[in-house]
Every structure is written in C-alpha cells, then in structure tokens.
Amino acid sequence: MYRSARSLHRFSASLSDLRAAQRSIKARNVCPAPGLRHQTVRMASSEAFRIERDTFGELKVPSDKYYGAQTVRSTMNFRIGGVTERMPIQVIRAFGILKKAAAEVNKDYGLDPKIADAIMKAADEVESGKLDDHFPLVVWQTGSGTQTNMNVNEVISNRAIEMLGGKLGSKDPVHPNDHVNKSQSSNDTFPTAMHIAAAKEVHEVLLPGLQTLHDALAAKAEQFKDIIKIGRTHTQDAVPLSLGQEFGGYVQQVKYSIARVKASLPRVYELAAGGTAVGTGLNTRIGFAEKVADKVSALTGLPFVTAANKFEALAAHDALVELSGALNTVAVSMMKIANDIRFLGSGPRSGLGELILPENEPGSSIMPGKVNPTQCEAMTMVAAQVMGNHVAVTVGGSNGHFELNVFKPMIIKNVLNSARLLGDASVSFTNNCVVGIEANTERINKLMSESLMLVTALNPHIGYDKAAKIAKTAHKDGSTLKEAALKLGFLNEQQFEEWVRPHDMLGPK
C-alpha cells in the first residue's frame, strides 16, 4: 500500500501521536454534568461528548446539544427541583425574539452581515420551539438569570456556527458573548425577556380565556333574566332578585378582571434592553435601545417601547408585581364565582339545588351515582395557587437591592404560571360547566315562596317594626307570611297580594 519505508514510518508516527492525544484528553479532570444523559444524535462530532471551555476551565458537553460549558456548569451547580422546575419555555422563546432583534440592530451598526444573519436564523429556531430540548436549566439559579441568558447565547452561537459550516464549541465564527450578546448584559436581557413572555402569555392565553368566560356568563344572565329567586346575604335569606341579576354580577366581575389586566400592560410593554449592566447603557450605541424595542414590537405585534428609565427597569420589577396583583384580583373573582355556582348547585336533594350543573364524570370511588362540581373545585384550586404565586412575586419584587433585582427567574415563573392557569381554567370552567348550567325552577320557586324576607316589601306600608313582627310570628308558628299578617291584623288579604309581589321587588320604583 505504501510506496516507501519512509511513508510507512510517517504514518506510524502520526498514529502514535493521535493515540497519545486521546490518552491525554481522557486523563484530564473533565466530566459531564451530573444528571445529563442524552441519546447521542451526531451533529458536528463523531464522539458522545465534545470539550468546551469557559473562564473556569474545560467541561464535557454532549455532542448532540447546542449549549456549551456555562450551561453545563449551571446544571452541575444548581441541582434544584429537576425537570419540573426548568425555566419556563415562554422565557426561552422570548429570548429568541430579543436575540433576533438585537442581531438585526447590531447588523445596522456594523456587525458582519454573515454573522448577524446566522444569529437571526438561529434565534428564529429558538423562538419557534425547534430548539426547546437545548435549554435544561432550572429557575433556581442566579437571580439575574445570567445562566439562562448564556444558555441562549451558547445555543444560538453553536447553531449559527453549524449553519456556517464551523465546529461546535469553537466560538468561531460566531461568539456567544461578542456576537450573540453584543451590546447586551444578562441584567437587561433577562428582564426584557420577562416582559416579552408575560405580555405574550396575557394576550395569547389569559385574555382570550377570560373573554370566553365573560361571554358564557353573559349568555346565562340573559337566559335567566326572568327567573326570580331568593337572595342571600350573610348566607341567610334576603330579598328577591332574578337569577339573571345574580349572574350579571359575575359578568361584571370578569369584565373588570379583563380591564384590570389590560390596565397593567403599559408598564409591561416597557423593555429594559439597552440598559446593559446597571442601566447606564455601557457598551451600546446611541439609539440601540429604541431600535431593539421597535424590532421586538414588529416581531410580536405588541406595542413594546424602550423603558423610560433603565435604572428602574433593572433594579425593580414593579410592572410585573402590578400585573401579578391584577391576576391576584382575577383569582379573587374566580374564587367567588366558582364557589357561588357550586353552592347554588349543591344537592341534589339535600342542598340548595337552585342550579343543575353538568355531570362530567363519576364523583366517588365508594358512593355509587355521586357526581361532584369538579370544574368549580379546579377553578378554586387555581385561584388559591394564583394567590400564593402573588405572595412570592410580592416578596421577590420588594427585594431589588441597589441597581439590580435578583429574584427575576422566580418572579417570571410565578407570573407566567398565574396567567396560564387562569386562562386555561377559564376555558375549562366555561366549556365544562358554565355553558351547561340550567336553573332548577321548581326548587327556586319553592325556596322563594317559603322565604320570610319577602316581608321587606311591607316596610313602606306598615313600617319596619310591624313587618318584623309578621316575620317572627310566621317563623315561630311555621306559617306563611300571609297567614301571620292576617292573624296579626296589620293588613288584609288584598293589601298583602298587592304589596308582596316578588317581580316588583327587583329594583327601584
């Protein structure tokens, strides 16, 4: 095969050098991140791992992953919670939007178009969800979200390198810091991604869900407008109202919920990008912040603008605390509405029984035929969770020390969780409960006719004291109001029939 002994000698020497290099690499103190076990999908390497470096040294990185050494190091240092505590994917995809916008602006300011275009294409893949499997980090990391920002930078860098025919982990020709993170800091990119993610979740999940619930309750209010029932205050009998009026109260609560959430959004639309490390904008160009905000707005269709004050945008998260407060108020409304509906539907024979709720599934593993108000229970649990989330957001928001709040990942995790839960629960509650609610008119009429509080209609005619005596007498004797009134001689039958008319007791005269 070889033409001379000299050629054979050179081949043997090269083979020896390769084997020596392999032994040297194996001898190094490099190890994969604990818990990272991936099915190897060969990308730019024929080995299961590649060697990457950060300022602390070398680490093994799975060859089928686009992230790099800093991401691996984070998985080693923050083994908290496992996969269920990973950074919300909405934040990762928001980062994709931001990194694309930044690359486009940096291109305008002189970044090599080839590099900028590759970054933008890779960022598109992050935003679309194509690269979701390359983001393993948990929420519980540095409070600025630095590890997640670098996770995004590394993934976009390596994917862009691959697109350009380079070697993964080489940082050439696309560097995660110098190019992907150009004119940026974790301190301004993470809060920017927080706001993008929160605004999108509100618009795409929460507000449509609340509107669906609002419309369904409004339809029921119209359907029930002519059904007169007894009201209740302090859980005791009160004067009548229509079932439609009762549901109308729920409609207004949801209407206000939508308005409160929308009212909080202008502050969420303000983006921290361009503030860099402490809000001064060090290492950015004049106009960078405004241009990035404009690009993000164009990419999302939402009215994002650059934050009026970058120091506030980095050091505080009052905008998200405000949004969380609105979500907390929504949860309060949902708790009241769901509780009312399940109590009005209690029974079927030993409860209030004024509403007939849809039967969706068996309710008991021991009591045959039992059906429970499961959608109401799910909604009230969601409401409780959102209230708890707001406590966490409040604590996190109040701990912005000096120039940087370092509770960012926890804050956005809870805000996104609240928005998603309320949006999803509103749709579930609507489709599986509200639209199928029917009025039990027989039960409603029976309870109303037996109520002593109809006596309130007599106040203008015979006075409070005499009306109260009629009610107490009827209760003591077990008689009707009419029987007690006639027995006491305070009015005649014709007067009672004229004055005590539930349909005339539904509003001012």
Curated annotation (Swiss-Prot):
Keywords: Chromosome, Cytoplasm, DNA damage, DNA repair, Lyase, Mitochondrion, Nucleus, Transit peptide, Tricarboxylic acid cycle. The record marks 377 as: Important for catalytic activity. Residues 1-43 form a transit peptide. Substrate binds at residues 144-146, 175-178, 185-187, 233, 365, 370-372. Gene3D superfamilies: Fumarase/aspartase (C-terminal domain) (1.10.40.30), Fumarase/aspartase (Central domain) (1.20.200.10), Fumarase/aspartase (N-terminal domain) (1.10.275.10). InterPro entries: Fum_hydII (IPR005677), Fumarase/histidase_N (IPR024083), Fumarase_C_C (IPR018951), Fumarate_lyase_CS (IPR020557), Fumarate_lyase_fam (IPR000362), Fumarate_lyase_N (IPR022761), L-Aspartase-like (IPR008948). Its EC number is 4.2.1.2. The active site is at residues 234, 364. It is an enzyme of class 4 (lyase). Pathway: Carbohydrate metabolism; tricarboxylic acid cycle; (S)-malate from fumarate: step 1/1. One of its GO terms (biological process) is malate metabolic process. PROSITE patterns: FUMARATE_LYASES. GO terms for cellular component: chromosome; cytosol; mitochondrion; nucleus. Disulfide bonds: none annotated. SUPFAM superfamilies: L-aspartase-like. GO terms for molecular function: fumarate hydratase activity. Catalyzes the reversible stereospecific interconversion of fumarate to L-malate. Experiments in other species have demonstrated that specific isoforms of this protein act in defined pathways and favor one direction over the other. Homotetramer. Belongs to the class-II fumarase/aspartase family. Fumarase subfamily. There are 2 substrate-binding sites: the catalytic A site, and the non-catalytic B site that may play a role in the transfer of substrate or product between the active site and the solvent. Alternatively, the B site may bind allosteric effectors. This is Fumarate hydratase, mitochondrial. It comes from Danio rerio.
